[in-house]
Regions:
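A short beta-strand motif that forms part of the nucleic acid-binding face
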Residues: 6-8, 67, 160
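Flexible, glycine/proline-enriched loop segments at strand-loop-helix junctions
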Residues: 11-15, 48-54, 79-86, 123-124, ...
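Charged, elongated alpha-helical interaction scaffolds
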Residues: 151-222
C-alpha cells in the first residue's frame, strides 16, 4: 500500500506563465487600465498610421497591402520592433515615446497606431504581457489597435488597447474604410441629390404653370 501526501502544489512550465499573466491581469484591472470608458475612439478616416511590428515577415506586408488597397490616401509609417525577447517591450515603449513626439516634414504624426505580430508560443508573446508596456499604452493619447498573434491568442495588450483585432490583416481592415464602399455611397448621394433637384424643379414648374393659368383666368374674366 502506497500513500502520497502533498503539502504544496506549484505551477510549472506553461501553467506558471498562465498564472503570472492572470495575476498581472487582476492587478492591472484593479488599477482601471482595462475599463471600457477609458477607451479612445478610432479616427474614421486616419491620415497616417504608425505600425509597430517586425520589419520582416508577412505581417507588415499584409498590413501595408490591405491599407493601401482599401484607403490609399492614408500614410503608413513602419516602426520596426523586436516582437519577442526579454527586452522587446522596452523597445516598444521607446518607440511609443518617439511617436507621440513625432515631427517630420515627410510624414504626418500618426493619428492611429497598430501593434502587430504573427502567431507564437506563450513565451514568445510575453513582451505584450509586460506591466510596464501595458501602463505606457494606457497613457497613450493616440488611439490604437492590438493585433497580436492569431484569433485565439490573447495578451494583456489586447485588454488595454482601444480595440482588439483578431489578426493583423483584420486590424488593417478595421483601421481604414473601403474606398469602393465610399465611392458607392457618394454615387448614391449624387443620384438622390439629382432626383431631389429634379423634383424641386418639377414642383416649381407646376407652381408657375398654375400661377400662369390663374392669371389667364382672371384676365379673361375681366
Amino acid at each position: 500500500v502506497y500513500q502520497l501526501i502533498i503539502d504544496q502544489v506549484e505551477y510549472s512550465g506553461t501553467g506558471s506563465i498562465l498564472k503570472l499573466i492572470e495575476d498581472r491581469k487582476k492587478e492591472l484591472s484593479l488599477l482601471g487600465l482595462f475599463d471600457d470608458d477609458k477607451k479612445k475612439k478610432l479616427p474614421k478616416y486616419p491620415k497616417s498610421i504608425g505600425v509597430l511590428t517586425s520589419s520582416s515577415g508577412s505581417v507588415i506586408h499584409d498590413i501595408i497591402h490591405r491599407i493601401s488597397e482599401r484607403f490609399p490616401v492614408t500614410q503608413i509609417k513602419v516602426f520596426p520592433i523586436s516582437v519577442q525577447g526579454k527586452n522587446s517591450h522596452i523597445e516598444i515603449i521607446d518607440f511609443l515615446d518617439l511617436i507621440e513626439n513625432y515631427d517630420s516634414k515627410d510624414f504626418l504624426k500618426p493619428d492611429l497606431i497598430i501593434f502587430a505580430r504573427g502567431g507564437g508560443s506563450l513565451e514568445e508573446l510575453m513582451p505584450f504581457n509586460e506591466p510596464d508596456l501595458i501602463k505606457r499604452v494606457f497613457k497613450l493619447k493616440i488611439p490604437n489597435i492590438s493585433a497580436i498573434g492569431h484569433d485565439t491568442d490573447y495578451t494583456l495588450l489586447d485588454y488595454v488597447s482601444d480595440l482588439r483585432a483578431p489578426t493583423p490583416t483584420a486590424a488593417a481592415e478595421i483601421a481604414v474604410p473601403d474606398k469602393n464602399y465610399l465611392l458607392n455611397q457618394i454615387q448614391d448621394l449624387q443620384v438622390k441629390l439629382n432626383q431631389s433637384i429634379e423634383q424641386k424643379y418639377l414642383s416649381i414648374e407646376q407652381l408657375l404653370l398654375r400661377f400662369k393659368n390663374s392669371v389667364n383666368y382672371f384676365s379673361n374674366s375681366i
